[in-house]
Design a protein with these regions (language model features):
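Pro/Thr/Ser/Gly-rich low-complexity, intrinsically disordered linker/stalk tracts
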Residues: 122-166, 215-233
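A glycine-rich, often tryptophan-bearing local segment used as a flexible ligand/cofactor-contacting loop or short
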Residues: 352-466, 470, 505
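Active-site-adjacent mobile loop/cap segments within catalytic or ligand-binding domains
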Residues: 9-12, 24, 64-129, 490-493
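Short beta-strand segments within Ig-like beta-sandwich modules, predominantly Fibronectin type-III
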Residues: 184-191
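Beta-strand-rich modules
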Residues: 195-216
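Aromatic-Pro/Gly-enriched surface loop or interdomain linker
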Residues: 222-344, 349, 507-517
Length: 519
């Protein structure tokens, strides 16, 4: 079979979705394919594809996605192939309502999976065979130190697919990376857990996939662990940076588009489709110049969320000396699979995490920095004497929406939101702890950009420990209480460009969190 995936032209001034069109050709070669099959097989293929796309998009995003039509037209891409052929005009690249979804990596995944499922169904139906769809990625991934010496216990959960009953995980593959090397070919396991023997002094990283007769899922986030040779403490790294997203949206009666200067979005791993910043936002120009952009990002492999940041934090912890660490997903903490109280220090990674309905218009996925369950867990951890490191670009902005959120960050984490840093240039300078370092501000090929990090203000008796060079506004706040300690950064730790700077900063933070200042 042959499928050409296109985007189409066309626009709606009322912000209605243009949606998907299918095209096939029957009037050629006496209505037959080269195998003698009726060319209406191409219509069947088109119908299955459009049906699956509309069903999955509507079910996942709760939007009334439009199935435009099935065209029997004379196009070379559907006329010339000697096999069942179709053109799928997925959406209109000229229409704002379509592209609000089209830029979202969650939407791209749903579309890709729907097309895959439809093709699988079509091929299997042609041959009279049952089909099985590959599983969804696993969740609730966590690593603990094992009961036996120098071992790690990995655990996770297989995911059911509410849209596809055949996509059940049957087995799993655990991939291992040693140090900065590449991942191995994996070990197949039958249950959602695995024990690994390790050598002290080496950072190990792991990712897990689910498998069945249909194939292998996308990989999990990457978690890391390290056993110090002369351990003086254990640290739990919690990965709370799950967000993938389209860019910030401008949607007013007069203007429409995407504001890369406010938030360029978070690609899944990377993005090669971006041309440049939008320049024309006038709704009056719809169908003409609305959406016109520059070209500064053409040919660039823009880095997004690599889901590999426990390793970055872990390498800095390793450099600090004699601290062991394990890591887990935030979902594992919220479900009680791991207890924060088992670790004297917790490093909570938030990256670019934030709840944002603007660039996630269907509101199907939420990326709250501190969910209600996590607020309760962190409150209990701090009140039991834990020491907490938090870093993320929206730790203030994302907690300004309700009085309850404000009270949590003010009373427990000891800071309040000031504002978001607005500046030009390709980098942001930060000073503190006897060091000056930079963060990338614009999309680039090395690390995700931190376009507008948070300025956070201390709640007494907390105090500022880092400042942004521009405006000298607080970038990080520390609290040294008799009950617990916190160190909160208004920017992501992993975005510090220089590894030497990350090592120095992490060592200083750990020293602050662990030193007994009463001596």
């Amino acid at each position: 079979m042959s499928m050409a995936l296109h985007s189409d032209a066309g626009f709606s001034k009322e912000d209605e979705i243009i949606g998907t069109l299918g095209i096939y050709t029957t009037n050629f070669n006496n209505g037959r394919l080269h195998a003698g099959t009726d060319r209406h097989a191409s219509r069947d293929l088109s119908d299955i594809l459009l049906t699956q796309l509309q069903r999955d998009i509507r079910s996942t995003f709760n939007v009334d996605w439009t199935r435009r039509s099935l065209w029997n037209r004379n196009y070379s891409e559907t006329r010339l192939p000697a096999v069942p052929s179709t053109i799928v005009e997925l959406l209109s690249h000229q229409n704002f309502a379509d592209m609000r979804l089209g830029h979202d990596p969650n939407f791209k995944f749903t579309v890709g999976r729907a097309l895959y499922k439809a093709i699988l169904q079509y091929i299997c139906s042609q041959h009279g065979r049952d089909y099985v769809v590959q599983p969804l990625p696993v969740s609730h991934f966590a690593i603990r130190f094992g009961q036996k010496k120098n071992t790690l216990e990995l655990s996770w959960q297989g995911e059911e697919d509410p849209l596809e009953p055949t996509a059940k995980p049957r087995e799993y593959i655990v991939y291992t990376r040693i140090g900065r090397g590449g991942f191995d070919n994996g070990v197949r396991v039958s249950s959602p857990s695995h024990t690994v023997k390790i050598e002290p002094g080496i950072v190990y990283s792991f990712k897990v996939t689910a498998v069945n007769r249909g194939g292998e899922s996308f990989p999990s986030e990457i978690l890391a662990a390290y056993k110090a040779k002369r351990e003086k403490g254990q640290i739990l790294i919690v990965n709370g940076f799950d967000r993938i997203s389209g860019p910030a949206v401008i949607d007013t009666p007069d203007a429409a588009g995407f504001d890369l200067s406010q938030d360029p979005g978070v690609p899944y791993l990377y993005d090669i489709s971006l041309c440049g910043a939008q320049q024309n936002f006038s709704r009056k120009e719809a169908g003409r110049r609305l959406g016109e952009s520059s070209d500064e990002y053409e040919g660039m492999k823009i880095i997004g969320n690599t889901f590999d940041y426990p390793f970055v934090h872990g390498k800095a912890i390793q450099a600090a000396g004699n601290y062991s660490f394990v890591s887990c997903s935030d979902e594992a903490v919220e479900k009680g699979i791991l207890s924060l109280e088992d670790y004297p220090i917790v490093d909570y990674i938030l990256g670019l995490e934030k709840e944002d309905n603007s660039s996630n218009p269907a509101r199907n996925t939420y990326y709250k920095t501190f969910s209600s369950p996590m607020q309760r867990i962190l409150t209990s951890y701090c009140q039991s004497g834990g020491h907490l490191l938090v870093s993320g670009a929206y730790v203030g902005t994302d907690m300004d929406s309700s009085q309850g959120n404000k009270e949590f960050i003010q009373n427990i984490l000891k800071y309040r939101h000031g504002n978001s840093l607005k500046t030009d240039g390709d980098k942001i300078a930060v000073r503190g702890l006897g060091h000056t370092f930079t963060l990338p501000r614009l999309p680039n090929e090395q690390s995700y950009p931190v376009t507008s990090p948070d300025c956070i203000l201390p709640m007494s008796p907390a105090f500022p420990v880092m400042t942004y060079a521009i405006g000298n506004t607080p970038a990080a706040v520390a609290y040294q209480g008799s009950d617990y300690r916190t160190f909160v950064m208004g920017f992501p730790f992993e975005s510090i460009r220089e590894e030497t700077s990350r090592n120095v900063i992490m060592a200083s933070i750990l020293r602050f969190l662990t030193t007994d200042y009463t001596d």
